[in-house]
Structure formats: structure tokens, C-alpha cells
């Protein structure tokens, strides 16, 4: 069971068990006679693994009547005081012995802890009443003042257990217990009358045998260190007994004397804290005297007992002080309680049943100091002798002390004997008090004072306080409880004084002290025994260590000897082996010498044989090498011949192929020339027919227009009055009218003047030309005659009249015209303004497409936001209304950009056509004076302009043209574009042929390549973006780099937009100052350029460049094979920094592509020579595009060579010169 539960159970049993009071009789001459007072019965139901709770019953052993009649009566208080002093002295002596080699304080603490546990487990608590006091009717009321704190740790003063155990409180239960004790003590007296040397009998109640200890604790002596201090085994008890009997008389006396001296010394130390009054002095004297007597008698009893150990009968005297018959609750070992029969004795714990107050005081000490004893080890050194006479030195295994007297001895060892000294003082005080009380006849019924010396009244009438010893601070708590407990204690003292005689009280005190002295003596015996055993063990250990060291040294010596012997043997063996080896080596050397001679002879014979074989092999090898060389040279010769034959064959094939190719080209050229001749003849016939027809129509139409114009003038004269009223409106309108001033003769027209009658014509609404009209090719493309002034096939009559036409030098009469809602009609631009208003240089110009006025800034196509105003304007060219300026000998135009020609007559016109061999003006009539620097006006009908403009289609004439501009004619295709077209389906058969006038049309150069002519203007350099034109020969304008054809751009192109300020070039193949199509890829090359992208993929453009490079370099070699590096360098000249450079791998891959009319045609032959690739270009036809430099042009070609040999990619200007 758990320790706390076991402890609580034992405490409750202790409170409920009636005590057996042993009354010590007169002790004289070493005799102690005890008288049984009461038997006790205690039952316990719990056991412990190491100790058992005992159930004490009356065993029928009754003490004999007192026979020592001569023993004087001893004062109880003095006896108690002396006992306390002796206990203190014994404690001091015990401490001194411990310091000198005795058991350590730890052993003592463990001892005390185990004693307390055994005391609590014996069930002695049942011998107490409810208030822990004895019955005053049966026992002496000698109580310790410290009894009140006996159970302060576990029980309250109300008699209830803190652990739930109820304590009986009725008086009837106390009476019943006392009756039981009386009956049992009488029966015990009759059974044990022969015990004791003087006929005194003792009732021995032995401790129950404890449970079997663990196997580790039952080993024989000397097995382990624990067995030295193990007092629970039978062998150990026998050894202690033998040790005591082996001691001499002097040694035994010394042990007892040490006890007495220690107790006296301790008592003296404690007395110096008490008061020096007479009462206290008498008390100290009584204690010392009592202690002297007690220890002397105790030793005498021990000596007598030791002398009778060999006999079989009872001892000559009473057992040791712990065996006091029925009063001590003793029981022989063979009379164990029935509950615990068969158990082994406890481990030497003496717990005696005493009802005296000293017992309770001792138990109170253990209840208070229970927490301080937890650190005790299980190596308990004490072994208390047994209570039976034949087993005295078994150290009290059959002795049960239930009053706690042994705890007083432990207290002496633990706390300097404070409890024991106070107990002795109480004995002395009560003895003295009872002597006085006998005289005063119990005058004071409540006589009693606190026994702890804190405050006590005396008969001499003074009250004094005794401060507690300074070292006893730990007991301050229990003093408070003692004061409360004294009130109960005094009541019972009065009752007990009546029930016990003075002699019994004295004997009880003696018995108590003797028990204490026996406990201390046993401690000393155990200490001496332990010292002896320790010394023996130490000696034995030393001997064993010495034996071990000696054995080790012997082993080492033997090992060294053996090692030496082994070394000697090894040396012997090595010497023998060396000799044997030397002998064998000599024999082996002789054998090897003979073998070497034989081997040398064999080797020489083999060497000679090998040398002979080697010579034979070398001869054979040389013959083989000569044969191989001969065969190799033969093979090389055959290969060379084969290569020569193959080369000759290839050369013949190439020559045959070249001849065939040239024949084919010649046949093709002849066929083309014949075809062109036929076409030219047909065109001439058609043009002649058309001219005649147009001349007739023009005459009819001119007459009709003249009549209509006259009618309109008359009608306008009639409305002059109405117009006069609107003067302000007339002024603004007159400003827009273009007068016809007289022109100076210095600005005569280069055309032959022809007088044409001016036919008035009514103004009609201007009708813009739609896209369908632009594609209508049914209209006449060229005038039927160069003198023709009007077009017979006019779709809509043009409203603008060039003004009055008359003979030279005459100014026609200006009639006021009828104000027509169309303010932008060209008829108004040809009229003069009112007098005094300066004429605008753009007054005679026709309106721009989209509503822009001539001379006003207009945004070019693609610049800025579409259909919005431009960010900044570009001034319209001054002469953009007129025909291109004809520059003889290709010189610089007379009017450079920026010239101020505001003084030019407004009606002065320029010839519509240039001299023979030069391109004509733009079909929209907007060619400028700077048209020299533009591209050829070989453009298809514009998509953005309308047919609001008019111009004359008359040819050159020897006569001087009149200053007034010619009559309006329908807008037709320029003659330079009409020539050479092959779209006979859309053209009229009456187209005129201007070939003779232009030294042959350049458009005929493309007639040999029929697939390229698909579509309108596919070969026109200025017809659409992306077609290459001829590079100009003039310095580049605006600081543009000539090496980059893409930068040669204009602010306006000539397709779908008005011309740039400088006009277009009138020379063939020139781009002029911004003339022609813009070929730049960037957006900031010029003002108003459109975003331009390549119209063909890179592979097509690169192949075209390769074709051009081969054409340019084909005369640099004789056989026509060109190095690839030369071709790359030639192409690099036309590559801009913005283009990706052409790699050799890409060039070879493109040469493998099949030629067609779009990528240049022809085929490339590739070969590898000396690790480098060479390319030979074979053209499909002798097209004029790839004609060699200096070759004669086509029939009617305006220039030699027909076309530039430098071809650029689509959309780019030609590369190289013109």
C-alpha cells in the first residue's frame, strides 16, 4: 500500500489502541520489578513490504509480585529530569562517537525514519483515548507537556483524523478498554510468573516478523556492502550477538559509559538555557542523580544477562530494560499474534507499548519530524536485541514499544536531545510537585504547568519565563499546540494521580529511561559492530587489493618471461633460416650461371637466324614497293587522261550549248524585231487614222464651242447691271478671274504659233472622274495630230476655257461672265481680275484635287493623317500648271527651285510636248518647270485626279504659238505612254505612233519579255510604286546620298498626287529632284512620302540582283565563270545598311531556284574550283534588260543599250549609272 496511506492507518490505529501501562517497581541491586496494569489488544489490517503492523494482545504473561521491597521511592519528576539529562549526554556521546568513526548522520536519520515507520505501523494508536490521554482511573497521569503536538501533523485536537479515520470520543469505550486490559493482564500474570531473576514476570509482546526481504538483501555476509549493515537477517543478528559476547568487561563498560557521559554532557548543554531559580536547580540535580542511578543499574543488568547467556534456564535477572513484562507489552517470539504468525521479525525496530506521557512525547517528535527523515537510505545499521532471554542480542525483534520511547533516543541523536531532556525534567518536576502536593493535600486542583519550560509557577510564588534554546527554533510550531493540549492533559493528570501510586509512577519513569538507555546502548553496540566489520572489510579489501597487485605483478613477470623466450626462439629461427637461405642462394647461383651460358648460346644462334630472315624480308619489301609505285603511276596516268577527256567533252558540250543558246537568242531577237516592225506599222496606221478622225471632230467641235461662247458672252452682257449691284461680291470674284495680259516677246512660246479661233463655251458643272472612268481606255490616248487643239472623243465638255484666242499682239475683249455657282471652274482662272488688283501667280492654275487651290500648301499622299490637314504645308511649284520646260542639250532648267517668276504673264503657255526623244508632260497637265529632274511621265491614269484640267494636244509647229493658251481638249493618255503598249483590247485602233518623234520609244525595250507586260504599266518606271527607274545623272537634291537609291525621293510622287515643287525630269530615266516614285523605305526621306514596303519577297529581289551582277561581270572573264566573292561584292554595292547582308549560303541557295520572268529568268551553273565556288549565269533569252553594255538598242530605242544594266530590287531605283 502507499506509504502515506500506511502512515495514516497506523496513526489512526495508534490513537484507538489502549495502552499497556507498565509500572516500574523499586529498582535495587540491579533488579527491576514491574507490575502489570492492563493488557492491550490492537488489530491491524495492513502490512508493509519491509515491515508489518503488529497486533498486540495480552499473552497471559503476568509479572510476579514485587519482591524488592527495599527499593526506595523515587520522585517521578526528578527521575524524568535525570532521564532527560542522561539522554542528552548519551546524544552528545553518540555524536562524538559518530564523528570519531561511528555511523554517519545519514545513517542515523535513516534509522530514525525506519523506527518511526515501524512505530506507526504497530497499531499502538488504539491504546490511546479519544483525546490521546490515559484513563485516570487506571494509570498514572504523567504527561509530557509536548504531548499536544504529538499528532499535530496528522490529527487535529478535536480528535478527528485528517485522513478520514474517525476517533472514538465516548467515555464508555474507554471504560470497556480498561476492563479488557485488566482481565488480560491478570491472565498473563498467571502464565509468566517465573520470568525475571527476582520472580518478577514480564509480559513480552514482540514485534511481528516482517515480510521476507528481497533476494538481494538475503545474501550471505560479506557478499556486498549492504550486508555489512543488514540487521534483518538471522546471520547478521548472530554476528552482533557474537560480537557483544566477544567483548571484554572493560569494552562493555566503556560502551555504557560512553552512553552515560554523552547524555550527561548533552543535558548540561541544554541546562544552560534554563533559569537559575531554586526550583530549576533542584530539578537539574534530580535529573543528574536519576540518570546516574539508571545507567548504573542498566549496566549491572547487562552484565548479569551476559553472564547467564550460556544457561538454558531463565536469565538470573530481568531482561534488558526494554523487556518489562506486561507493562512493556512484551511477547516472546514463540507467542506471536495469530494474525502475523510465520512472518519474519522486523528489522530491529523497538517500539514499546507505554502509556506514559514520555512515550507520547516521543511519538510526537516523530510525527513532527517525519518530513525530515525522507532522505534516510535503506542501509539501516541498527539491530536491536530480541526481548526473550535466550535471544537478547537479536536486538528486540520481539520487542514492541508503542509509547514512542525509542523515538526519544532518535530525537537525542537528531535534535540534541531536547525532547529527552524535557522528558527528564518533567519526571523531576512532577516528583517534586507531588511531594509538595502531598503536603498541601491537593490544594490546587488545577496544578500543572507547561512542561516545556516556557512558563511555570512554583510553590515559592514566583513566575519566570524560560526562553527556548536558540537552536530549537524548529519546534516553535509545536509549542503552540502543546499549550492547547495541556488543558486536556491537566484534567487527566488529576485523575491518574488518584489511580496510580507514587511507587508505580517512579517505576514507570525508570522503565521508560531503561528502555531509552537500551535503545542508545543498542545503537552503540551496532556502531561498534559496524566499525569492527568495516575495519575487517577494509583489511580484507586491502589484502585483496594487495593480492591482486601481487597477482598482476606475477602475471606481468610471467608475461615478460614468456615474451623473452619467444624472442629468443624467433632469433634462433631467423638465424637458421638465414643460414638455409644462404646455402640455397649459393646453389641457385651456380645453377643460374650454367643456365645463362646455355641461354647465351641459344640466343646467338637465334640472332643469326633472325638477321638472315630480316634481309630476305627487306628484299621482298623493296620489290613490292617498286611494283606498287609502278602501278600507282599507271593509275594516275589513266586518271589524268580520263579527266582530260572528260574536260574536253564538257568543253564541247558547253560550246554546243552556247552555240545553241546564241542561235536561239538570235532567232528570238529577229522574231521580236519583225514583230515590233509589224506592230509599229500597224500603230502608225491606226494613229494616222485616229488623227484624221480627231481633226475632223475637233473642227466641228471648235465651231460649235465658238458659237456657244458667243452666246454666253451676250447673255453675260445683259446681266452686267445685276452684277454691278453686288460690287463687293464682284471684287472677290474678279480676283479669281485670270486676265490675259500681253506677253513680252522675250517669253515667246517655243511652239509655232497657230491662230485658232476661240469659241465661247457655256460653263458646265465640273464632274469628277471616277475609278471606272480612269480605267476606261476607249478614249483617245494621243491627239490625232500635233496641231489638234481639242479632243473629238470628249466624254464631258470641259468647262474651263483658256481665254480668248486671237492673233498675236491683240488682246481679246473681256466680257463679263455670268456668275456660275462653281467657283472653282477653270474658266475663271483664265480670266483677268479687276484693274488695280495684283494678279496671283496661281490665278491661271486649275484647282487641285480634293479642293486645294494652286500654290497653297497641300499634304502629299501618305503624309500625316489621311483626309486631314497636313502638319506643315509644301508650296506648290510655280510652273506646275504649265508644260515641262524644254531644256536643250540636257542643261539646267532656266527656272531653278525658288525662283520668283511672279512677273510671268498668266496666259503664257508652254508646249505640251517636249522635243523628239524626250518624255512628254504628265497627262494631268501639271508638269512643272523642274520636270527635268523628275521621272518619265509614263504613268497610268491617276487614281486621285479628275478630268478637270485640260491641255492642248497639238504637236510642234514651226509657227509661233499665240500667247493665249490653246482651247481645252479632253484629257488623254500622254503620247509617251501610248507608244509601245500592247493592250490592244482596251485601246482604239486609231492610236497614233510617236516613235519617229522620240527616236524610238523606250517602252519597246520591254516588248521582248512578254510575261512581264501583263497588266497596265507593269514595266513603267513611274507608273506604280516598286518598279525600278533610271538613276539620275544630276547631283542629288537636298544633300541626299546618291549611293543609296532609297534616299532619292521626292516630297510628292507623280502618281495620284500633284507634282513636287521642282517638277519631274524631262530626261529619260532620270529621277530628278524628287521626280518619279519614292524609293525610300523610311518615312522621313521627304515630306509627304507614303509608307513603302517591298512589293516582292527577298528571294526574288536577291535573284534579280544576282542576275544583274552576273550580267555586269560576264565580260570580266573569258569563259563566263564568276567567283562567288566577286558576285557578292557587286551585290554589296547595291545593298544599303538597312538590308541584311547576303551570305554565301543564301546566294548559293537562291542560285538553285528555277528562273521565271518575275525573278530574272535564266539558270545558274555552280562549280567548285580550288575550294571556291564559281557561278555561270545562262540567260533564257537575250532580253534588252540583260543586254551587254554597249550593245545596240532596240529599233526606236531612245538610248543606247535600251536599259540600265544595273538592276535593283523591285521598288528600288536602279543601281549604278544611267
Swiss-Prot record:
Residue ranges, compositional bias (Low complexity): 34-50, 86-95, 206-216, 716-730
GO CC, any one term: cytoplasm
InterPro entries: Fungal_stress_NST1, NST1
Compositional bias per record (Basic residues), positions renumbered to this chain: 75-85, 174-183
Database matches in Pfam families: NST1 (PF13945)
Principal location: cytoplasm
Keywords of this entry: Coiled coil, Cytoplasm, Stress response
Amino acid composition bias (Basic and acidic residues), ranges on this chain: 107-123, 224-237, 431-440, 544-715
Polar residues: compositionally biased ranges: 1-26, 51-72, 159-171, 769-796, 940-963
Keyword Coiled coil applies: yes
CDD domains: ATP-synt_Fo_b (cd06503)
Family membership noted in the UniProt record: Belongs to the NST1 family.
Protein name: Stress response protein nst1
Protein source organism: Botryotinia fuckeliana (strain B05.10) (Noble rot fungus)
Gene it is expressed from: nst1
Amino acid at each position: 500500500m502507499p506509504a502515506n496511506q500506511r502512515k495514516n492507518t497506523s496513526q489512526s490505529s495508534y490513537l484507538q489502541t489502549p495502552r499497556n501501562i507498565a509500572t516500574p517497581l523499586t529498582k535495587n541491586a540491579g533488579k527491576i520489578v514491574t507490575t502489570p496494569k492492563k493488557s492491550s489488544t490492537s488489530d491491524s489490517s495492513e502490512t508493509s513490504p519491509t515491515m508489518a503492523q503488529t497486533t498486540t494482545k495480552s499473552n497471559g504473561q503476568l509479572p510476579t509480585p514485587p519482591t524488592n521491597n527495599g527499593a526506595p521511592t523515587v520522585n517521578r519528576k526528578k527521575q524524568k529530569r535525570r532521564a532527560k539529562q542522561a539522554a542528552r549526554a548519551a546524544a552528545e556521546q553518540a555524536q562524538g562517537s559518530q564523528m570519531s568513526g561511528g555511523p554517519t548522520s545519514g545513517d542515523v536519520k535513516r534509522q530514525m525514519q525506519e523506527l518511526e515507520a515501524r512505530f506507526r505501523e504497530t497499531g499502538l494508536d488504539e491504546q490511546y483515548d479519544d483525546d490521546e490521554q490515559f484513563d485516570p482511573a487506571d494509570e498514572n497521569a504523567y504527561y509530557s507537556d509536548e504531548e499536544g503536538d504529538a499528532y499535530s501533523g496528522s490529527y487535529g485536537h478535536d480528535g478527528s483524523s485528517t485522513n478520514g479515520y474517525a476517533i472514538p470520543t465516548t467515555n464508555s469505550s474507554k471504560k470497556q478498554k480498561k476492563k479488557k486490559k485488566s482481565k488480560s493482564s491478570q491472565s498473563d500474570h498467571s502464565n509468566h510468573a517465573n520470568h525475571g531473576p527476582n520472580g518478577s514476570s514480564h509480559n513480552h509482546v514482540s514485534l511481528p516478523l516482517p515480510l521476507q526481504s528481497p533476494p538481494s538483501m538475503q545474501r550471505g555476509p560479506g557478499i556486498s556492502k549492504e550486508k555489512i549493515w543488514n540487521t534483518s537477517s538471522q546471520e547478521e543478528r548472530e554476528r552482533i550477538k557474537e560480537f557483544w559476547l566477544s567483548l571484554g568487561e572493560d569494552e562493555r563498560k566503556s560502551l555504557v559509559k560512553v552512553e552515560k557521559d554523552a547524555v550527561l554532557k548533552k543535558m548540561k548543554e541544554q541546562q544552560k538555557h534554563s533559569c537559575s531559580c531554586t526550583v530549576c536547580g533542584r530539578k537539574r540535580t534530580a535529573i543528574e542523580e536519576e540518570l546516574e542511578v539508571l545507567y548504573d543499574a542498566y549496566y549491572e543488568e547487562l552484565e548479569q544477562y551476559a553472564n547467564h547467556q550460556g544457561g538454558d534456564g531463565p536469565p538470573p535477572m530481568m531482561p534488558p530494560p526494554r523487556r518489562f513484562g506486561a507493562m512493556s507489552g512484551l511477547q516472546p517470539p514463540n507467542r506471536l499474534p495469530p494474525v502475523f504468525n510465520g512472518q519474519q521479525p522486523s528489522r530491529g525496530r523497538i517500539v514499546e507499548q507505554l502509556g506514559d506521557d514520555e512515550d507520547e512525547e516521543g511519538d510526537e517528535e516523530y510525527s513532527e519530524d517525519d518530513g525530515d527523515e525522507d532522505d534516510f537510505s535503506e542501509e539501516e545499521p541498527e539491530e536491536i536485541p530480541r526481548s526473550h532471554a535466550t535471544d537478547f542480542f537479536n536486538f528486540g525483534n520481539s520487542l514492541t514499544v508503542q509509547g514512542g520511547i525509542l523515538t526519544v533516543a532518535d530525537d537525542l541523536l537528531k535534535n540534541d536531545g531536547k525532547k529527552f531532556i524535557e522528558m527528564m525534567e518533567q519526571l523531576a518536576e512532577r516528583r517534586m510537585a507531588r511531594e509538595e502536593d502531598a503536603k498541601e493535600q491537593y490544594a490546587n486542583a488545577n496544578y500543572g504547568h507547561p512542561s516545556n519550560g516556557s512558563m511555570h509557577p512554583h510553590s515559592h510564588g514566583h513566575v519566570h519565563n524560560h526562553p527556548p534554546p536558540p537552536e530549537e527554533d524548529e519546534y516553535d510550531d509545536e509549542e503552540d499546540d502543546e499549550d492547547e493540549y495541556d488543558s486536556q492533559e491537566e484534567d487527566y493528570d488529576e485523575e491518574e494521580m488518584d489511580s496510580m501510586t507514587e511507587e508505580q509512577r517512579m517505576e514507570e519513569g525508570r522503565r521508560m529511561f531503561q528502555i531509552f538507555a537500551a535503545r542508545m546502548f543498542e545503537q552503540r553496540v551496532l556502531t561498534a559492530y559496524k566499525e569492527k566489520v568495516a575495519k575487517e572489510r577494509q583489511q580484507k579489501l586491502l589484502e585483496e587489493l594487495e593480492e591482486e597487485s601481487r597477482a598482476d605483478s606475477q602475471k606481468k613477470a610471467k608475461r615478460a618471461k614468456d615474451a623473452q623466450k619467444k624472442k629468443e626462439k624467433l632469433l634462433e629461427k631467423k638465424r637458421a633460416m638465414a643460414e638455409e637461405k644462404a646455402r640455397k642462394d649459393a646453389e641457385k647461383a651456380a645453377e643460374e650461371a650454367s643456365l645463362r651460358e646455355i641461354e647465351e648460346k641459344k640466343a646467338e644462334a637465334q640472332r643469326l637466324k633472325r638477321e638472315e630472315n630480316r634481309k630476305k624480308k627487306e628484299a621482298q619489301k623493296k620489290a613490292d614497293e617498286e611494283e606498287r609505285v609502278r602501278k600507282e603511276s599507271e593509275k594516275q596516268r589513266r586518271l589524268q587522261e580520263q579527266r582530260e577527256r572528260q574536260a574536253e567533252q564538257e568543253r564541247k558540250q558547253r560550246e554546243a550549248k552556247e552555240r545553241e543558246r546564241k542561235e536561239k537568242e538570235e532567232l528570238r531577237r529577229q522574231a521580236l524585231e519583225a514583230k515590233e516592225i509589224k506592230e509599229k506599222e500597224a500603230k502608225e496606221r491606226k494613229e494616222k487614222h485616229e488623227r484624221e478622225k480627231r481633226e475632223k471632230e475637233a473642227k466641228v467641235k471648235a465651231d460649235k464651242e465658238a458659237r456657244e461662247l458667243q452666246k454666253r458672252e451676250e447673255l453675260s452682257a445683259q446681266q452686267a447691271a445685276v452684277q454691278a449691284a453686288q460690287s463687293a461680291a464682284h471684287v472677290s470674284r474678279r480676283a479669281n478671274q485670270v486676265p490675259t495680259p500681253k506677253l513680252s516677246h522675250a517669253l515667246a512660246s517655243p511652239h509655232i504659233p497657230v491662230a485658232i479661233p476661240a469659241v465661247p463655251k457655256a460653263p458646265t458643272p465640273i464632274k469628277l472622274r471616277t475609278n471606272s472612268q480612269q480605267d476606261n481606255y476607249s478614249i483617245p490616248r494621243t491627239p490625232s495630230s500635233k496641231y489638234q487643239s481639242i479632243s473629238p472623243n470628249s466624254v464631258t465638255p470641259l468647262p474651263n476655257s483658256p481665254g480668248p484666242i486671237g492673233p498675236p499682239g491683240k488682246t481679246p475683249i473681256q466680257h463679263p461672265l455670268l456668275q456660275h455657282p462653281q467657283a472653282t471652274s477653270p474658266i475663271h482662272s483664265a480670266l483677268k481680275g479687276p484693274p488695280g488688283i495684283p494678279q496671283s501667280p496661281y490665278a491661271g492654275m486649275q484647282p487641285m484635287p480634293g479642293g486645294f487651290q494652286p500654290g497653297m500648301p497641300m499634304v502629299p499622299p501618305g503624309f500625316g493623317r489621311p483626309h486631314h490637314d497636313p502638319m506643315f504645308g509644301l508650296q506648290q511649284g510655280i510652273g506646275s500648271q504649265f508644260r515641262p520646260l524644254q531644256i536643250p542639250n540636257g542643261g539646267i532648267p532656266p527656272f531653278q527651285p525658288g525662283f520668283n517668276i511672279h512677273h510671268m504673264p498668266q496666259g503664257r503657255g508652254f508646249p505640251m510636248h517636249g522635243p523628239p526623244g524626250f518624255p512628254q508632260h504628265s497627262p494631268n497637265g501639271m508638269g512643272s518647270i523642274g520636270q527635268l529632274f523628275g521621272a518619265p511621265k509614263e504613268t497610268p491614269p491617276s487614281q486621285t485626279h479628275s478630268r478637270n484640267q485640260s491641255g492642248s494636244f497639238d504637236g510642234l509647229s514651226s509657227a509661233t504659238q499665240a500667247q493665249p493658251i490653246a482651247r481645252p481638249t479632253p484629257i488623254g493618255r500622254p503620247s509617251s505612254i501610248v507608244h509601245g503598249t500592247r493592250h490592244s483590247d482596251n485601246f482604239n485602233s486609231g492610236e497614233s505612233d510617236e516613235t519617229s518623234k522620240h527616236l524610238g520609244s523606250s517602252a519597246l525595250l520591254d516588248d521582248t519579255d512578254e510575261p512581264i507586260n501583263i497588266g497596265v504599266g507593269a514595266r513603267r518606271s513611274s507608273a506604280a510604286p516598286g518598279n525600278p527607274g533610271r538613276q539620275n545623272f544630276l547631283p542629288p537634291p537636298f544633300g541626299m546620298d546618291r549611293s543609296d537609291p532609297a534616299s532619292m525621293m521626292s516630297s510628292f510622287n507623280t502618281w495620284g498626287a500633284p507634282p513636287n515643287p521642282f517638277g519631274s525630269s524631262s530626261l529619260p530615266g532620270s529621277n530628278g529632284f524628287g521626280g518619279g516614285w519614292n524609293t525610300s523605305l523610311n518615312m522621313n526621306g521627304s515630306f509627304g512620302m507614303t509608307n513603302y514596303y517591298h512589293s516582292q519577297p527577298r528571294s526574288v529581289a536577291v535573284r534579280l540582283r544576282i542576275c544583274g551582277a552576273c550580267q555586269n561581270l560576264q565580260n570580266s572573264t573569258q569563259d563566263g565563270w564568276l567567283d562567288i566573292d566577286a558576285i557578292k561584292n557587286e551585290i554589296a554595292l547595291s545593298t544599303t545598311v538597312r538590308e541584311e547582308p547576303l551570305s554565301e549560303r543564301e546566294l548559293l541557295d537562291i542560285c538553285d531556284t528555277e528562273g521565271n520572268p518575275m525573278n530574272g529568268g535564266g539558270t545558274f551553273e555552280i562549280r567548285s574550283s580550288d575550294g571556291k565556288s564559281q557561278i555561270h549565269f545562262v540567260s533564257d533569252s537575250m532580253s534588252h534588260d540583260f543586254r551587254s553594255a554597249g550593245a545596240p538598242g532596240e529599233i526606236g530605242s531612245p538610248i543606247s543599250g535600251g536599259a540600265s544594266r544595273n538592276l535593283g530590287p523591285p521598288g528600288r531605283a536602279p543601281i549604278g549609272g544611267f
